[in-house]
Amino acid sequence: MKKLLGIVVLGLLLCSNSFAGKMAVKKTIKLPKDIVQGYKNKWNFSCTWTENGKCMTPDYAYQIVNETDGHPVRFGKQSIRIELRKGDCHQRRKGSYNDCKASPPSERHEFGMEYDDVSPIRGITWHTYSLYLPKDTPQINSEWITMGQFHNLDYNKPPINLDLSGKHFYLVTRLLCIHPKKLNKRCYSTEPGNTREKILDSEELFGQWNDFIFNAKWSSKEGFFKMWVNGKLLYHFVGRTVVPKDGTMFKFGIYRGKVYSGDGEGTHIVYYDEIRYAKKSCKKLKLEDLGYSCSDLENQTVSRIDKIK
């Protein structure tokens, strides 16, 4: 009898585990104001089409978590925990793009601004997000591991990625790929004219929050893009920042090249918080919450402004 009772109790504990089972995420998601501010649109989340017509994702994929439960939080009381495991692919509807069958194949759990809405990311904008990678984050041999990107609505080469590589964090640009001389042609992030710049070393990256602030003018002619990391201006680009007649969307989560069988469990976990957006004015971001001053940020310069020659 005691053995049977033990089995029943264990079963109840497993069923109550918040990271067990699957959830349908075909509908858009409204994220809490404690975490996301300024974005008027709702969000979609990567999922996998099933034969019964639902788009499903494991419920460990993302969780709204609380500081009171021991989770890291940058400001306020909550953050978003995202987990990606080996084989987690995205295909939003039958016959659409499939991560698993792509060339090269990929895996993702990623939030994106609702794709069917008119993008608010036009003209001059300001953005922030804060990212926390646990100290025990594994080194995974993946072709790329993206944790935040500014992506075109239609064109398939995102101009700005932030990537984990080994124990370091990099800014990766494909601004050359949207330049008139390379538009609609084969173009890789490794080509001269694009940028791959290390922005955080391992001792700065793991087990602590890192803040990213962006200011851009999204233009198919003379735009600009600036990035601050933990309050320091590290990158400034001047030139085309968006494809003509296209728009820009922000995506965050984990998007990576396929992890193969010889690379352990292949599990990544990352926390996001303070995802903020404002048009034109830095002051609307309320960066004092995070310990920054708009006037201090805007007065900073870099030794070299990046341009496409």
Please place each PLM-identified region on the residue numbering.
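Positively charged n-region of N-terminal signal peptides that target proteins for export
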Residues: 1-4
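Sec/Tat signal peptide C-region and signal peptidase I cleavage site
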Residues: 16-20
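Low-complexity, Ser/Thr/Pro/Gly-rich disordered linker/stalk regions
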Residues: 21-309
